[in-house]
């Protein structure tokens, strides 16, 4: 969003308001990030405690369906556009997240000082710190399930929307003010679903109100004011221009008019200013200007095009990032794969922002700087070796918010080509269905994928290297199953001969403990955390919110069980969260979230490898492939609500005179449902789900080899299991 734009437009009395009726028989292009951000940050739809829980908003799906239905009821067809491979603006997002950590600390200080109402208010101001990109895939899945069209742009959603505005593909555009910098005549700036009306503005009236003389001068004004991919010109930020105090967009226009120069000349004029040098502002302005002028979009025929390509500089890749294969953009455009790994490859950079808890813990910093490296290099190698040799020889710089000046290098060239390791997975539908029927397992379940390989004959026969005489995989069940087998082999659960490894056998033990498909993904995620030595009862975080009642043993066991519960979600009504909070468990969930996201990248790149290497029938529709992708594990982020519920229950039991008695257990469960978590759909049922997940994870721990879980740690788990069995 252009800094100061809304304030300026309101003061200048710009814009118009019309009823949704005017959108009848129209296709409305909607900038997805702006649409989601409005839900997250404005009343009555925002959930103030989302930054204190992590994960996904409880009411988001219902709100999206309601708002989409409202548009459709008025005869309007919504068409959502998501940003894709975005390299510009990452530094701005990083700095914004770093600044937000101070407000995060303030909110938690208020909560710790027993001022919950003030804390909730402060948390409510932090809704903008939620990384909307982490919610993209969830929202896309909602849209897909409800038959709402969407497209992921090659790069900027704003540029993509401008390129289709007023065409047969899109009659009108709604989104952030950034879109006005691109070639567009009119923009809907607000959709008011309560009043069923919208506000809109024209680019021409903005230009006239600012008194600038050309569209290029208007674009410079917007850039220098500050936007999503360029910070505000320091002289405007520090109010050193001599202009009357007011919206930055007005000040930027006045500065350009007073000097009768363009944006580049103005930046050259201030280039030696220490603030300009510190921000490398001239270089960043020039890149941002070219980013707008030579934007990249996808045409209806799937062709990727650059605007004004004839005058584009030869080093445009320094602005947009390395050019990626059009096949990758095609899969991205329909949600078959996400943008994370593509962004890494295009920009040669991974940027780690601070998590919602603030990121003060050494354990989290070690995880993102070192612990996630194997997952990242696995995803990068799957893409690089399947796409083009060029990408294999470009090191990726990992920059973390706590030490941005000392990036670490990830070298894909140091890895081996993973394709030869996993190319033997081309199992046919008849084999898959026959085995699923025999096991009485759903083909879509992880328990089937792992359990099928307990049969040594099936495992042996599953070695099916693709050859010229074999037809490629052509059914969703085939593609999904083989993508998952490849993923699990890459993660070490399956050996080269397709037999289960020691890790795979432990995982199978976990799945056999309870026949609950909804707990399979949490169990696998817990096992991955165990492998990283992050599923334990160690005090890893310098925060409040850990168990406080009972003996040291009670506290240790409560903490371990609560951390396991964080892998499964609390089923909550479609309303903002009400209940106790824990910064300690939020910090733990931040680590779980980081691992989950990187596991998802490996899963998606396993699917990409199948597609890019012609193991899948090329005639399969992109929508069909997308449906497969959205069914794969680790799609949605996790929150700490169920972990808090388990901690609250067990902590309260430890304060009872007879913590293991049925009377105490029932009384605390009723109290939890009625007083602590009044909007939980089934507090007691979710506690039992958490305990069932504990049973599964504990079964895997007990069966784990000593090099994964030491005898000392197994004893801690065993003691906790006995302790918990009396408190369920």
What are these regions (language model features)?
Residues 32, 177, 588:
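Residues that line or immediately flank small-molecule/substrate-binding pockets and catalytic motifs
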Residues 3-4, 25-152:
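Noncatalytic, basic helical substrate-engagement surface that gates or grips nucleic-acid strands
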Residues 20-24, 72-73, 165-168:
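Flexible, charged surface loops at secondary-structure boundaries
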Residues 92-306:
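Extended two-metal-dependent nuclease catalytic cores across DNA- and RNA-processing enzymes
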Residues 72-82, 96, 102-104, 113-114, ...:
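Non-catalytic, largely sequence-independent nucleic-acid-binding elements associated
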Residues 1-25:
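N- or domain-start disorder-to-order transition segments that initiate the globular core
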Residues 19, 31, 87-88, 132-133, ...:
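Alpha-helix initiation/capping motif
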């Amino acid at each position: 969003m252009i800094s100061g734009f809304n304030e300026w437009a309101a003061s200048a009395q710009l814009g118009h308001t019309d009823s949704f009726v005017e959108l009848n028989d129209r296709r409305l292009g909607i900038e997805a990030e702006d649409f989601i951000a409005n839900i997250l940050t404005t009343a009555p739809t925002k959930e103030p405690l989302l930054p204190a829980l992590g994960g996904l908003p409880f009411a988001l799906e219902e709100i999206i369906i309601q708002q989409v239905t409202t548009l459709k009821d008025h005869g309007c067809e919504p068409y959502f556009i998501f940003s894709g491979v975005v390299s510009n603006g990452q530094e701005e997002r990083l700095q914004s997240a770093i600044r937000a950590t101070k407000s995060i600390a303030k909110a938690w200080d208020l909560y710790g000082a027993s001022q919950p109402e003030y804390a909730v208010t402060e948390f409510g101001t932090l809704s903008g710190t939620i990384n909307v990109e982490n919610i993209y895939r969830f929202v896309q899945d909602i849209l897909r399930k409800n038959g709402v069209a969407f497209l992921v742009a090659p790069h900027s959603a704003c540029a993509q929307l401008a390129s289709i505005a007023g065409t047969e593909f899109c009659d009108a555009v709604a989104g952030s003010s950034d879109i006005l910098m691109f070639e567009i005549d009119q923009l809907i700036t607000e959709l008011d679903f309560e009043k069923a009306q919208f506000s809109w503005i024209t680019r021409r009236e903005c230009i006239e109100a600012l008194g600038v003389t050309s569209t290029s001068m208007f674009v410079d004004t917007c850039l220098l004011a500050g936007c999503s991919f360029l910070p505000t010109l320091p002289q405007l930020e520090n109010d050193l221009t001599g202009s009357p105090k007011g919206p930055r967009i007005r000040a930027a226009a006045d500065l350009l008019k007073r000097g009768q120069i363009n944006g580049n000349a103005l930046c050259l004029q201030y280039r030696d200013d220490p603030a300009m040098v510190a921000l490398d502002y001239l270089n960043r302005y020039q890149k941002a200007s070219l980013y707008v002028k030579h934007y990249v979009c996808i045409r209806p025929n799937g062709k990727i095009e650059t605007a004004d390509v004839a005058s584009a500089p030869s080093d445009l890749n320094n602005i947009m990032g390395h050019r990626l294969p059009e096949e990758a953009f095609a899969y991205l455009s329909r949600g078959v794969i996400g943008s994370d790994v593509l962004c890494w490859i295009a920009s040669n950079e991974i940027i780690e922002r601070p998590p919602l808890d603030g990121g003060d813990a050494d354990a989290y910093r070690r995880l993102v700087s070192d612990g996630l490296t194997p997952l990242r290099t696995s995803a990068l190698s799957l893409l690089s070796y399947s796409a083009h040799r060029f990408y294999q020889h470009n090191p990726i710089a990992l920059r973390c918010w706590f030490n941005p000046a000392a990036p670490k290098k990830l070298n894909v060239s140091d890895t081996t080509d993973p394709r030869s390791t996993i190319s033997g997975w081309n199992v046919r539908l008849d084999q898959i269905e026959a085995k699923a029927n025999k096991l009485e397992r759903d083909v879509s379940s992880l328990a089937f994928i792992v359990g099928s390989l307990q049969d040594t004959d099936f495992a042996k026969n599953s070695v099916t290297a693709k050859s010229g005489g074999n037809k490629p995989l052509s059914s969703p069940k085939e593609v999904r199953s083989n993508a998952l087998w490849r993923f699990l082999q890459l993660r070490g659960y399956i050996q080269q001969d397709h037999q289960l490894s020691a890790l795979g056998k432990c995982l199978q033990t976990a799945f056999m403990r309870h026949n609950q498909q909804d707990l399979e993904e949490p169990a696998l995620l817990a096992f991955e955390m165990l492998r990283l030595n992050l599923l334990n009862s160690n005090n890893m975080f310098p925060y409040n919110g850990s168990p406080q009642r009972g003996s040291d043993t009670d506290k240790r066991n409560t903490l371990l069980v609560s951390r396991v519960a964080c892998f499964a979600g609390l089923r909550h009504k479609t309303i903002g969260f009400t209940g106790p909070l824990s910064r300690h468990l939020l910090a733990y969930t931040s680590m779980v979230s980081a691992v989950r996201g990187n596991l998802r990248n490996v899963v998606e790149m396993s699917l990409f490898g199948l597609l890019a290497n012609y193991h899948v029938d090329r005639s399969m529709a992109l929508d069909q492939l997308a449906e497969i992708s959205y069914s794969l594990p680790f799609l949605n982020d996790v929150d700490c609500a169920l972990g808090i519920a388990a901690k609250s229950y067990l902590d309260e039991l430890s304060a009872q005179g007879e913590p293991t008695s049925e009377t105490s257990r029932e009384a605390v469960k009723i109290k939890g449902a009625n007083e602590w978590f009044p909007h939980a759909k089934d507090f007691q049922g979710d506690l039992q789900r958490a305990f069932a997940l504990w049973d599964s994870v504990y079964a895997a721990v007990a069966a784990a080899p000593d090099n994964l879980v030491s005898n000392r740690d197994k004893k801690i788990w065993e003691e906790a299991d006995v302790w918990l069995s009396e408190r369920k």
